[in-house]
Regions:
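N-terminal low-structure segments adjacent to metalloprotease catalytic domains
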Residues: 1-117
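The catalytic-center signature of Zn2+-dependent metalloproteases
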Residues: 3, 181-246
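Residues that flank catalytic or metal-binding motifs in active/ligand-binding sites
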Residues: 33-39, 71, 142, 164-166, ...
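Residues embedded in well-ordered secondary-structure elements
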Residues: 64-66, 135, 203
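Generic structural signal for residues positioned in beta-strands
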Residues: 74-76, 145, 167-169, 212-213
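Short, histidine-centered active-site or binding-site loop motifs used for metal coordination
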Residues: 77-81, 174, 218
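Metzincin-family zinc-dependent endopeptidase catalytic domain
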Residues: 87-193
Length: 246
């Protein structure tokens, strides 16, 4: 009897291990596989399981921002040497994130300048974030990490992108080119691009709807001539996707 029990336990351990390996492998894929369709959002809502399965893609920290566990949001801002952030843009971004999350939101600008690189690929961005990021989601505060960087090596037209499940990268030199150095348009471009990337961190995908913030044109840039023409809020369709019935 004892031998049978040991065999059963060993088989259970083996089955559990194999199951974990299969799910772990699927969790690392961007495909709409069984795990991602049925379990990813559930596991990602819990920090422990998020760490176990290595869930660090856009949208995996959605529950941190929209759930009830964290009561505040903090934006940690790092700026590459030679670049600058529009304070009016940061103030507006803070207010808009506070409105969408329903949580008091603030930002803090690091006093350390990030080493300048002319072009950035994903690997270099990872290295810079690992080197310069100080804070993390903890206590009652969910973190958003915002990096003002130079430009994308992979696509010179990219205005911004997401980093892991909590970060936003703004390509400031590209934003300045698209805004033609107009401070009013530049600040709104920064807000629009950052909020678009935050939408991805809330789990929103691109759409092709005119006037919607998650329209892919916001990410790759388009020439708005006036500050008031820049899209600065989620549209009704996107709010419904986030669970806001208005």
């Amino acid at each position: 009897m004892r031998r049978i029990l040991i065999v059963v336990l060993l088989l259970a351990v083996i089955a559990a291990s194999v199951g974990f390996i299969i799910l772990k492998t699927q969790s690392l894929s961007d495909d709409q596989n069984f795990f991602n369709r049925n379990f990813r959002s559930k596991f990602a809502a819990n920090e422990f399981w998020r760490a176990i399965f290595g869930l660090q893609s856009s949208g995996d920290a959605r529950a941190d921002y929209l759930g009830s566990r964290y009561k505040k949001v903090l934006i940690e801002v790092d700026i590459m040497q030679g670049l600058s952030a529009q304070i009016s843009g940061l103030d507006a971004l803070k207010d808009k994130i506070q409105k969408i999350t329903g949580k008091p939101t603030d930002y803090i600008i690091s006093d350390r300048a990030v080493r300048y690189y002319r072009d950035l690929d994903t690997e270099l961005i990872d290295d810079l974030v690992d080197q310069y990021q100080i804070r993390e989601t903890s206590g009652d505060t969910a973190l958003i990490y915002l990096l003002y960087a130079s430009r994308s090596q992979e696509d010179a037209g990219f205005l911004g992108l997401t980093h892991r499940e909590y970060g936003i990268v703004l390509f400031e030199e590209t934003l300045k080119e698209f805004s033609r150095e107009d401070p009013g348009i530049l600040a709104n471009y920064e807000v629009s691009t950052a909020l678009h990337e935050f939408g991805h961190q809330l789990g929103l995908d691109h759409n092709d709807r005119p006037g919607c913030l998650m329209n892919e044109e916001v990410e790759i840039g388009r020439f708005w001539e006036r500050p008031e023409d820049v899209i600065l809020d989620f549209c009704e369709f996107e709010l419904q996707q986030l669970g806001f019935n208005r």
